[in-house]
Curated annotation (Swiss-Prot):
Residues 36-198 form the EngB-type G domain. InterPro entries: G_ENGB_dom, GTP-bd, GTP-bd_ribosome_bio_YsxC, P-loop_NTPase, Small_GTP-bd. Coiled coil: none annotated. Necessary for normal cell division and for the maintenance of normal septation. This is Probable GTP-binding protein EngB. Belongs to the TRAFAC class TrmE-Era-EngA-EngB-Septin-like GTPase superfamily. EngB GTPase family. GTP binds at residues 44-51, 70-74, 88-91, 155-158, 182-184. PROSITE patterns: G_ENGB.
Amino acid sequence: MVKCKLFFWLISWFLKVKNVEKVWKFLKSCPENCYSDPQFAFIGRSNVGKSTLINALANKKIAKTSTKPGRTQLLNFYKNESEKLFVDLPGYGYAAVSKTKKHQIDRIIAGYFQKDQPISAVFLILDARVGFTNLDYIMIEYIIQQGFKLHILANKIDKTNQSTRAILLNQCKKLKLNCLLISAKNKNNLSKLQELLE
């Protein structure tokens, strides 16, 4: 009887350990793509909430966030519980960085989106309060030209009204792009995003 209880306790402990292992984790930061496995890319202007979204999907803080734009300046790689790769790219369009740093970030982004990269889909994140900017349109055109599947994530919808959200959806419709209104902070519509990541 004691041996039987011990056996079941060991099985229970083993399953708990396996479940603990199956969580999101940070892998590494690189100036270029250092993995050949299929991956989902998150890109957007500085301070739109890319890192916050990674944390919301992971249900824990694995990506460093800051109220100051320009925190992410390398490719940050993560792996989820299903062993899928996610890439948090540097934010573009932040004016308060040196010209040298800006060129460096541009090179990292351009280098990542080469046509031979193993990218399953790109998620371009907007601040829903601001909407599309000229830089966003340029980035959208570039990603499409490179042949990658593109989705628009309008983040921070918890800080917008119905009229603003309707305008965003109409703009996406004109661009013929799939658009999902989300809030990384409140986790609004994250379940729908999870479906896109399957």
